UniProtKB/Swiss-Prot annotation:
This is Pre-mRNA polyadenylation factor FIP1. It comes from Eremothecium gossypii (strain ATCC 10895 / CBS 109.51 / FGSC 9923 / NRRL Y-1056) (Yeast). Belongs to the FIP1 family. Residues 1-94, 292-323 are annotated as: Disordered. InterPro entries: Fip1_dom, Pre-mRNA_3'-end_processing_reg. Residues 19-34, 66-94 have a biased composition (Acidic residues). The gene is FIP1. Keywords: mRNA processing, Nucleus. Its main location: nucleus.
Length: 323
């Protein structure tokens, strides 16, 4: 009886399992299509003894799976520990160098030879530069004597005396009306950016025309010929002659006041300018330098001596006549 009851229970369980399998087939698809005849063989009735025997196998399988999972976890932990140890080792390998000097123990043979070669190269360069500097010293001394010329010839210096150019043409030869663009006429433009020294467009045009007129009229040859013509006409020496006459007249009046004798000799006249010399100092003769004897002084003194002797003779004659 017990055996029958057990068989009945097993049959019910199998029916329930088959119903569950049908539901899974409907929802997720059948596994028999992939398995084929193997799946059909699994659906056969399993005796109770075999069913009881298979349960421990599943437990063992689960236990094996759990063991595998534990092994994997242990392996992961070991790998993490190894990585941590590697990081610590790499951190410990870092070296902090405080000194700035070169460590000869870490330099190769090529690096050790470079300082000596550099020293030899610098010594050779100094030996080559030394005679050049000695030879260039006199040249520098000569150039220091003429500092003005050196400043004028300085490279890149701005020549303020040179006339500015626009497209290769001096600005004094350019008519602003000819230019296509006149930026100084735009509203808000600053004239000082285009015209210096307070010029405007109108005053600059007047300045250009005046300069052009002066350049055309200026002729040194013409001016010299005009002076020569005035000299030949005697107009350049009139002022000097007139001044000499006035001085001589003033000298005679002065002598008349001093002496009652009207026959007294007059003062020597100043030397007249020779022909061809323009009057200087307003027609007056130039002042003689210290220690310089003015011209015609000897002749004037001779005339004065003879005149004095004559005056003395006439005065003595007059005295005799009175007696």
């Amino acid at each position: 009886m017990q055996l029958r009851a057990a068989q009945h229970l097993i049959a019910e369980e199998l029916q329930m399992a088959s119903s569950d399998d049908e539901d899974e087939k409907f929802l997720y698809g059948s596994e028999d299509e992939a398995d084929g005849p193997r799946g059909q063989q699994k659906r056969k009735l399993i005796p109770q003894g075999t069913a009881q025997i298979q349960e421990p196998d599943t437990k063992r399988a689960r236990g094996a799976d759990d063991g595998d999972v534990d092994m994997l976890d242990d392996d992961d932990e070991e790998e993490d520990d190894d990585e941590d140890e590697d990081d610590e080792d790499s951190d410990s390998d870092v070296e902090i160098i405080i000194g700035t000097g070169a460590d000869s123990s870490k330099l190769d043979s090529k690096a050790l030879t470079t300082p000596s070669t550099a020293a030899t190269a610098t010594s050779a360069a100094e030996s080559a530069i030394a005679p050049v500097s000695e030879q260039s010293a006199p040249v520098a001394a000569v150039q220091s004597g003429d500092s003005g010329a050196a400043m004028d010839k300085a490279v890149g210096a701005l020549d303020i005396n040179a006339v500015g150019e626009y497209e290769g043409t001096p600005i004094t030869d350019i008519d602003p009306e000819v230019l296509k663009e006149k930026p100084w006429r735009q509203p808000g433009a600053n004239l000082s950016d285009y015209f210096n020294y307070g010029f405007t467009e109108e005053t600059w045009m007047e300045y250009l025309h005046k300069q052009e007129k002066l350049r055309k009229e200026y002729n040194p040859r013409k001016i010299l010929m005009g002076l020569l013509a005035l000299q030949q006409q005697g107009k350049l020496g009139d002022g000097g002659a007139g001044d000499g006459v006035m001085l001589s007249a003033g000298g005679m009046a002065h002598n008349d006041i001093k002496s009652p004798n009207k026959n007294n000799g007059s003062l020597p006249q100043p030397p007249a300018f020779p022909m061809g010399m323009p009057p200087m100092f307003g027609g007056f003769p130039p002042f003689p330098f210290p220690g310089m004897i003015p011209p015609n002084l000897g002749a004037a003194s001779g005339n004065n001596g003879s005149g004095n002797h004559q005056n003395m003779g006439t005065s003595s004659g007059n005295g005799n006549n009175g007696k």
